């Protein structure tokens, strides 16, 4: 049987960036890793309804900077920034260093593998037919410009006695092309029949130029020059 390598892991440092970017010596490494895990665990649980795609953690000069990628930034920020301030205090307590929280909006949630998987599990938990949920996710992604998408669900589908796996694919999903920008993520639906696993692969196109092309910042908008009165 052909086994699949993790699509994100194989592309790290080629076209994918790490979710935690920091350096530490041997003594500090384990503590940093443990606090990263606890921060992610806390934020994922606290922001379960905020459509969080990914959490990026950086550690500049004895502090921690957390960037939350979400499709619903208003829920994370709260009224006048109250909620995000509460989160910042808890993150600072967990990490033991001053914390800063940034919010990044996911503009197209239909093209984000984690949000697509979460959308499918919420439908499965509401007893929507799994084929309908899969097909809807695939159609939405292709309509918004995905080059290809594959969705796989496994478990006691439709309450069947024997668990099975079903998948649906549209377009191209090249798993071996390292320069391919493939967004992959998983999620679990907890139904009355048991747990149903959902996997989503979304192919967004090829990235030429490696990490330099990925990390290149967008050019800032230049202010328009104002014409002086009386001059043409």
UniProtKB/Swiss-Prot annotation:
Residues 39-107 form the KH type-2 domain. Disulfide bonds: none annotated. One of its GO terms (molecular function) is rRNA binding. Pfam families: KH_2 (PF07650), Ribosomal_S3_C (PF00189). Signal peptide: none annotated. One of its GO terms (cellular component) is cytosolic small ribosomal subunit. One of its GO terms (biological process) is translation. InterPro entries: KH_dom (IPR004087), KH_dom-like_a/b (IPR015946), KH_dom_type_2 (IPR004044), KH_sf_prok-type (IPR009019), Ribosomal_S3_C_sf (IPR036419), Ribosomal_uS3_bac-typ (IPR005704), Ribosomal_uS3_C (IPR001351), Ribosomal_uS3_CS (IPR018280). Keywords: Ribonucleoprotein, Ribosomal protein, RNA-binding, rRNA-binding. Binds the lower part of the 30S subunit head. Binds mRNA in the 70S ribosome, positioning it for translation. Part of the 30S ribosomal subunit. Forms a tight complex with proteins S10 and S14. Belongs to the universal ribosomal protein uS3 family. This is Small ribosomal subunit protein uS3. It comes from Yersinia pestis bv. Antiqua (strain Antiqua). The lineage of its organism: Bacteria, Pseudomonadati, Pseudomonadota, Gammaproteobacteria, Enterobacterales. The gene is rpsC.
């Amino acid at each position: 049987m052909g086994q699949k390598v993790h699509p994100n892991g194989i592309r790290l440092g080629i076209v994918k960036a790490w979710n935690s970017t920091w350096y530490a010596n041997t003594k500090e490494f384990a503590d940093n890793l443990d606090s990263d895990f606890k921060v992610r665990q806390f934020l994922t649980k606290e922001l379960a309804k905020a459509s969080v795609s990914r959490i990026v953690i950086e550690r500049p000069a004895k502090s921690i900077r957390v960037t939350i990628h979400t499709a619903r930034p208003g829920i994370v920020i709260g009224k006048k920034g109250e909620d995000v301030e509460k989160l910042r205090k808890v993150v600072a307590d967990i990490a033991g260093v001053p914390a800063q929280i940034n919010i990044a909006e996911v503009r197209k949630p239909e093209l984000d593998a984690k949000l697509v998987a979460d959308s499918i599990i919420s439908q499965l938990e509401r007893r929507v037919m799994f084929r309908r949920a899969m097909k809807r996710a695939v159609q939405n992604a292709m309509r918004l410009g995905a080059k290809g998408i594959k969705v796989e669900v496994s478990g006691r589908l439709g309450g069947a006695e024997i668990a099975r796996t079903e998948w649906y694919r549209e377009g191209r999903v090249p798993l071996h092309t390292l320069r391919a920008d493939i967004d992959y993520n998983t999620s679990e639906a907890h139904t009355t029949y048991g747990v149903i696993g959902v996997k989503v692969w979304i192919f967004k196109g090829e990235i030429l130029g490696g990490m330099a092309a990925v990390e290149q910042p967008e050019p800032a908008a230049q202010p328009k020059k104002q014409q002086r009165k009386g001059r043409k």
